[in-house]
Structures are given as C-alpha cells and as structure tokens.
C-alpha cells in the first residue's frame, strides 16, 4: 500500500515554517512519521507546495493537483498519485502516530472497503486513515461543488470505523491524534516527549 503525507505549505502560526519541519524531541515531525511508515508503505509520497524541502529523504513529492482545496485537495492528489488500490493518508502535524497503528489501519483495508477511518472520543480522524483510490472521481466532484469537509461524506461510503475502544487498546495515553496547531501544542508535545523519555530511563535504571 502506498502512503501519502499531506504536508501542505507554510504555517503562519509558526513564522512561515512548514509544520512537518518542526522538531518534537530530537526529530522533526516529518522524520518521526517517516520512521513509522518505512517498512509499511510500498511508496511514501509527500503532497507539498515545496518539493525542494524533501530532497534527499527518499520520498516522492507531488504538488497539489487542485491548489487551494485544503485537506480534501491533498487527499485527491494522494488518490490520483497512488499506484495501489488503497492509500494511507497522514496529516503532517501528527507527531505521535505509530507504525503499529498505521499497520492496523492498512490491514483493515480490502476490496469491499472504501475507507478505514478512526473515530476517537474527539470525533472522526480523517487525516490518519486509509482510502480506496477509486474514490478519486467522487472527491473531485466534491471539490468542484465547494464541499471541502471530509467528514461530511464518510457516511455515504463503505467505511470501516476504528472506534475509541479499539484505539485505546494501542493508545492508552490518547496521543495518536495529538496534532500540532499552535506554539502551545508544540511546547506540550516536547514536554510529553521529555516525560516519556524520562519514564523510559527510569525503567532502564530502577
């Protein structure tokens, strides 16, 4: 299965920096996601307005097919660029996704499934999900109609929901869908990493 990171462009809240380049712990969010995807994805694509930033990383970069269409436009680009029946889609601001959880999503995809989408206690998580590439024409029509909210059309699809209880089995701390949208979020993410690193050190040195 191919995977696509939706990197978008620069974020004004971070002084014009690409959110995927922000450091959480000792690695950028992009590098953390790349580590989770390697060994899982056949190809790793990055949908971005700045392909030059990802040179030398071993990923393929793709510009938005429909600029200005937000996350749905990024999803459409991923669907049209993927060479597999399904594509794993990941927003660039999720520093705590794990290979185990992404692999679980990929394993649930099949010929009778249009989408595999987590639904946490905070609601649908459509940008950490798997979609059938055959959905591309439907997504294109939604973009052309101006209906850009991804969650609006999930009920019309053959969607395999990954519910909160199922998520909690692999994510007891509730961090999988923590997204970095502000400087406060970035600070909290780094504090969480420091705390987790300290806990791991304590376990090694009782």
Locate each region found by the language model:
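Hydrophobic helical membrane-anchoring modules
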Residues: 186-206
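Conserved anion/nucleotide-ligand pocket segment
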Residues: 178-180
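Nucleotide and nucleotide-moiety/phosphate-recognizing core
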Residues: 1-176, 191-197
């Amino acid at each position: 299965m191919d995977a696509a990171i939706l990197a978008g462009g620069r974020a004004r809240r971070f002084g014009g920096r690409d959110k995927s380049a922000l450091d959480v712990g000792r690695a950028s969010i992009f590098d953390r996601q790349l580590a989770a995807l390697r060994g899982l994805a056949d190809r790793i694509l990055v949908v971005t307005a700045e392909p030059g930033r990802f040179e030398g990383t071993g990923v393929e970069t793709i510009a938005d097919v429909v600029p200005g269409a937000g996350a749905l436009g990024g999803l459409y680009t991923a669907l049209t660029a993927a060479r597999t029946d399904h594509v794993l889609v990941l927003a660039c601001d999720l520093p705590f996704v794990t290979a185990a959880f992404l692999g679980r999503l990929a394993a649930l995809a099949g010929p009778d499934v249009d989408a595999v989408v987590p639904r946490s206690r905070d609601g649908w998580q459509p940008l950490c999900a798997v979609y059938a590439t055959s959905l591309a024409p439907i997504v294109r029509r939604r973009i052309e109609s101006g209906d850009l909210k991804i969650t609006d059309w999930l009920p019309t699809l053959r969607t395999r929901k990954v519910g909160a209880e199922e998520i909690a089995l692999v994510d007891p701390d509730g961090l999988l869908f923590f997204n970095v949208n502000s400087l406060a979020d970035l600070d909290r993410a780094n504090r969480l990493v420091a705390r987790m690193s300290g806990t791991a050190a304590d376990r090694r040195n009782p």
